């Protein structure tokens, strides 16, 4: 029997244990506790072991933890099954002031599905000291108050809970007051100042006390407040409220006038001392008074302004109930108003610009501005997202929560768009959601990245010569797409030398307007083409710019009248006398009028006309239209007048034409008298010239020696230059120029001509030019006529020495063309048959593309010298004389008058051959030879 009882008891105990185990496994509830502010990795518990799970089955069964709140506070290590702290846990932030604070977790495993509930209690630590709302409180106490009278004080608050929030108060030692702390049903401390000894206002009007609040944590934390007690004269029974603290809940969007609470206080006194009025206490802040209003008679508190949960989610209003006695007494209570949040705030954005204006060459990802977004609402109404308008070279980059950076996403070009107006939109997560926009003006700062450009790389300008000094000839303009200083352009000349003078002595350019001015009158005879560069530079750092080339063609004007070459021996009154035998036939050349014109083109194309004398009969003479040769038109007979006064008009083809006149006196003599007259004239000239013969001989020898040395130097220099590599802006050698002057007056020059062109480089030296008829002729050019070369021009001495009456050197007519103005040259072909000896045909017409001239005086062309022979004559630069170095035979005799005559030469030569032994005739030949040299 006893045995059976014992077995029955054991069975019952086993059954009870199984029931408890089954109940525990079915509930799946685990409890852990950790202190707040635990560090990351703090051990919480062996959750796998406590749940009866093996470590090897955690992963296969998909062990996972879910949280109802923040899921990142706790984490489970699947390797060892330990629950640990993953992030900082702040109990005050997590649970506010709730007595119990727990983190609820749900552990879920599959195969089979099981759910376990885990509760982790967060223990409070003493990390918040007590705090008073004010650093000083003021009380007014009547001196008639009896000992043990109590005066409410605003207590301190502690964010902690439990023992850490259990506050103890103490007062600095004094003989009048003490502290008393009461706790209501909500365990809220109600602090009162207790009067222990009667006050005497006449003895002490003011008392200063220090209240110290100490919490119950370890270690203890404290807070203090100053009490200023003013002693008043007043009353016996004070009004009293039903409660010392009233709690009210109110929506934050409650309109103005909404009733918050109606207070009721009572006073045991009678009469006027029983009548009570209600006021806000002196402890109430002005901000609270602006949002609430109290009816002093009824005690109703109403909303007076806009409430905002985000500004303040609770208000503590201290109310005084004061009787109307002469010495009023007051009662006190506190109304705590707690606000409930609604989604009534749009997101807020704060934009801080860091890099404005933005340079257009700023690198990508440059931070332009920082944008901070926030929403004063809480909960789901609080999260904010930010976005930027599309199709702009910027983007938003989220750096931290509620922080965005506005960065450069693609390259900028200020010349395309200088200002970007960006719109940033911020939107919260409420329902319905609220949004806000903000504008950001991004100005693009200019950098000097645009080269100054002219409309074209080269300009061609035509300017007439003899312009007034300082005249405006052209305006250059360059465009720059930059701004401000980078677009300020200044123009300047690229200074070079033009010949022996600087470019700035010819032209100048205005630095701001780009106007080009001629500083002096331009002379076509000096400069035909002025080529230079104008530079445009901006004011950027570093400055940018470019150059443009100006080709200024100086157009010729007919400003030079034909100039007659002075005769060797003049007649009376500036006229020239010529003796002509009566036996000459038609076409006999009597004399030649020589004239030159410094102009070019048609302005230098000379023609000759014979002006008839008034009242005179038809004379038997004529003048070549373009040669200036005076010849007979018919045979002379005995009936002709013995003397003729011929007036030759020399006229150019300019507009208007300019003229010069020459007078020739022609005397008709018998055939035997002409040589005698010539001999007498020559003999008369020997006397005054004899003194100069020796000097001229020495001078000729010296000049020939110097010229030979200089010719050798020039030949050596030319050979070196031709062997060297040609460079830019250096005059290269052209075809040889052939200018011949012989006894019969025939001369020519090659088709290749070098025109005067003044550029930025110095022209080649042409101080000495030797001309030899023995130079080989270059191959006939079949190319199109080239532009005139400005590097070479005839000197005044060469002009004076030419036998041609038509001086067409550089007589081109400027015509605009693709490559510049072309030169049209009046020409006479050397192959054209001559109608009469001593004349040349007039030019076929302007525009004939030929630069070759051959003038023929006398019955035939002169014979060209051989390669080894010396030239008949050469020209000394700076001297109007053409020196003859040809050796004449001893019996030769040449007679020349002031103007070159040809028919008389041939007749004289025949007579000289018949009289070789005559000594007097030899003297005449020597005199005539000297005269010829002077004339040339």
From Swiss-Prot:
UniProt-listed InterPro entries: Cadherin-like_dom, Cadherin-like_sf, Cadherin_CBD, Cadherin_CS, Cadherin_N, Protocadherin/Cadherin-CA
5 X 4 AA repeats of P-X-X-P: annotated span: 773-890
Biased composition (Basic and acidic residues): 895-909
UniProt topological domain (Extracellular) ranges: 29-696
Keywords in alphabetical order: Calcium, Cell adhesion, Cell membrane, Glycoprotein, Membrane, Repeat, Signal, Transmembrane, Transmembrane helix
Positions with biased composition (Polar residues): 774-786
PXXP repeat feature ranges: 773-776, 785-788, 818-821, 873-876, 877-890
Annotated Gene Ontology cellular component terms: plasma membrane
Residue span of region Disordered: 759-793, 815-875, 887-936
Gene3D superfamilies membership: Cadherins
Cell location: Cell membrane
A GO biological process held by the record: cell adhesion
Signal peptide: 1-28
Stretches assigned to the Cytoplasmic side: 718-936
Glycan-bearing residues: 264, 448, 547
Annotated membrane topology: Single-pass type I membrane protein
Molecular function per GO: calcium ion binding
Pfam families: Cadherin, Cadherin_2, Cadherin_tail
Domain of life: Eukaryota
Transmembrane segments: 697-717
Protein role: Potential calcium-dependent cell-adhesion protein. May be involved in the establishment and maintenance of specific neuronal connections in the brain.
Designated name of the protein: Protocadherin alpha-5
Protein species of origin: Pan troglodytes (Chimpanzee)
């Amino acid at each position: 029997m006893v045995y059976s009882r014992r077995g029955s008891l054991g069975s019952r105990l086993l059954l009870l244990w199984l029931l408890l185990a089954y109940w525990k496994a079915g509930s799946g509830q685990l409890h852990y506790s950790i202190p707040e502010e635990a560090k990351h990795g703090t051990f919480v518990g062996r959750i796998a072991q406590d749940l009866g799970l093996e470590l090897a089955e955690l992963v296969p069964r998909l062990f996972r933890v879910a949280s109802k709140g923040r899921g990142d506070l706790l984490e489970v290590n699947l390797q060892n099954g330990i629950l640990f702290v993953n992030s900082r846990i702040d109990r005050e932030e997590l649970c506010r002031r709730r007595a119990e604070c727990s983190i609820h977790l749900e552990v879920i495993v599959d195969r089979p599905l099981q759910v376990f509930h885990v509760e982790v209690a967060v223990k409070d630590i003493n990390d918040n000291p007590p705090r008073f709302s004010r650093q000083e409180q003021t009380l007014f106490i009547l001196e008639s108050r009896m000992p043990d009278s109590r005066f409410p004080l605003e207590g301190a608050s502690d964010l902690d809970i439990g023992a850490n929030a259990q506050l103890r108060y103490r007062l600095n030692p004094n003989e009048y007051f003490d502290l008393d702390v009461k706790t209501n049903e909500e365990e809220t401390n109600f602090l009162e100042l207790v009067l222990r000894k009667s006050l005497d206002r006449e003895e002490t009007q003011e008392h200063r006390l220090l209240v110290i609040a100490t919490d119950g944590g370890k270690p203890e934390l404290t807070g203090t407040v100053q009490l200023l007690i003013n002693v008043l004269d007043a009353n016996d029974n004070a009004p009293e409220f039903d409660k010392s603290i009233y709690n009210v809940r109110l929506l934050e969007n409650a309109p103005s006038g909404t009733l918050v609470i109606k207070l009721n206080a009572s006073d045991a006194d009678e009469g006027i001392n029983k009548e009570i009025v209600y006021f806000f206490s002196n402890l109430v802040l002005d901000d609270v008074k602006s949002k609430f209003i109290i009816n002093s008679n009824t005690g109703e508190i109403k909303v007076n302004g806009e409430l905002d949960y985000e500004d303040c989610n609770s208000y503590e209003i201290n109310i005084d109930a004061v009787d109307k006695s002469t010495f009023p007494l007051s009662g006190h209570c506190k109304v705590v108003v707690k606000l409930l949040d609604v989604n009534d705030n749009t997101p807020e954005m704060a934009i801080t610009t860091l890099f404005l204006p933005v340079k257009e060459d700023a690198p990508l990802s440059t931070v332009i501005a920082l944008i901070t977004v926030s929403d004063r609402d809480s909960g789901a109404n609080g999260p904010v997202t930010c976005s930027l308008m599309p199709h702009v070279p910027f983007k938003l980059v989220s750096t931290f929560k509620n922080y965005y950076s506005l960065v450069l996403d693609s390259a900028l070009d200020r010349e395309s768009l200088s200002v970007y107006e960006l719109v940033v939109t911020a939107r919260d997560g409420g329902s319905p959601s609220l949004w806000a926009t903000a504008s950001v003006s991004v100005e693009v700062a200019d950098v000097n990245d645009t080269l100054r450009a002219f409309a074209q790389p080269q300009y061609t300008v035509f300017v007439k010569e003899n312009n007034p000094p300082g005249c405006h000839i052209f305006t250059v303009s360059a465009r720059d797409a930059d701004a401000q200083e980078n677009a300020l352009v200044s123009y300047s000349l690229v200074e070079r030398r033009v010949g022996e003078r600087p470019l700035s002595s010819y032209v100048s350019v205005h630095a701001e307007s780009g106007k080009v001015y001629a500083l002096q009158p331009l002379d076509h005879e000096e400069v035909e083409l002025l080529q230079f560069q104008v530079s445009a530079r901006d004011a950027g750092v570093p400055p940018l710019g470019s150059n443009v080339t100006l080709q200024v063609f100086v157009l010729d004007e007919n400003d030079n009248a034909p100039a007659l070459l002075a005769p060797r021996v003049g007649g009376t009154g500036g006229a020239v006398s010529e003796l002509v035998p009566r036996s000459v036939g038609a076409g006999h050349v009597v004399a030649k009028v020589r004239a030159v014109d410094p102009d070019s083109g048609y302005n230098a194309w000379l023609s000759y006309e014979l002006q008839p004398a008034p009242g005179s009969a038809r004379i038997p003479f004529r003048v070549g239209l373009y040669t200036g040769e005076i010849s007979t038109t018919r045979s002379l007979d005995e009936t002709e007048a013995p003397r003729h006064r011929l007036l030759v008009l020399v006229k150019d083809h300019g507009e208007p034409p300019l003229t010069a006149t020459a007078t020739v006196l022609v005397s008709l003599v018998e055939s035997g008298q002409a040589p005698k007259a010539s001999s007498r004239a020559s003999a008369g000239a020997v006397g005054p010239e004899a003194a100069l013969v020796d000097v001229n001989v020495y001078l000729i020898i010296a000049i020939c020696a110097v010229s030979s040395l200089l010719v050798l130097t020039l030949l050596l220099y030319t050979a070196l230059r031709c062997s060297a590599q040609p460079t830019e802006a250096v005059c290269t050698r052209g075809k040889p120029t052939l200018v011949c002057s012989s006894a019969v007056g025939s001369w020519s020059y090659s088709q290749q001509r070098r025109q005067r062109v003044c550029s930025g480089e110095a022209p080649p030296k042409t101080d000495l030019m030797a001309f030899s008829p023995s130079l080989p002729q270059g191959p006939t050019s079949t190319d199109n006529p080239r532009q005139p070369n400005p590097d070479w021009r005839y000197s005044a001495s060469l002009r004076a020495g030419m036998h041609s009456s038509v001086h067409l050197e550089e007589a081109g007519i400027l015509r605009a063309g693709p490559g510049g103005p072309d030169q049209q040259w009046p020409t006479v072909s050397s192959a054209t048959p001559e109608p009469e000896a001593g004349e040349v045909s007039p030019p076929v017409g302007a525009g004939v593309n030929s630069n070759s001239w051959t003038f023929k005086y006398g019955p035939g062309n002169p014979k060209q010298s051989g390669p080894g022979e010396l030239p008949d004559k050469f020209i000394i630069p700076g001297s109007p004389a053409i020196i003859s170095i040809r050796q004449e035979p001893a019996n030769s005799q040449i007679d020349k008058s002031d103007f070159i005559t040809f028919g008389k030469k041939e007749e004289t030569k025949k007579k000289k051959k018949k009289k070789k032994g005559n000594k007097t005739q030899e003297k005449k030949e020597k005199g005539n030879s000297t005269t010829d040299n002077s004339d040339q």
